[in-house]
Amino acid sequence: MAGKRKARKLPLVQTEAILPDLQSCVLCEDVRCEFNGMQTLVGVLNIVPTPKLPVNYMRLCIWTRWCSGAGRFHQRSKIVGPDDNLTIAQAEVDFDLKQMEGHATNVHYFGGVQFQQFGLHHVEIYLGDELRLRFPLPVIEVKPPSA
């Protein structure tokens, strides 16, 4: 059968990105990479209790996982103050999702984060210019234990 060629499937050319879902987002004090490639989130935060201000964190991390999308994307993560005007910490990263079944995990490390006000702060996650997630982070005053 000279002249006959075996048909082969060509990869699909993707012209438009398929926006991913934000599967998970966690604010924590550290992210460790274990020997098996898994990640361990340390000191998960949902509130910042403090007897006085300012309160400092040597390190804070925002861990995100995106799935069910395809294309190249830009993520911006922010921690904003109670008035929504003050950005306390911000980081950005570009990432790729090559296939719909895949996922992308991003970790933003912030050093020397300082909260100078009590009140309801927020963590914000943007995909491009679109706000995809916003959750509260209360900084509250706690009385030190009496002696």
Map each language-model feature to its residues.
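Contiguous segments within soluble domain cores/interaction surfaces
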Residues: 2-147
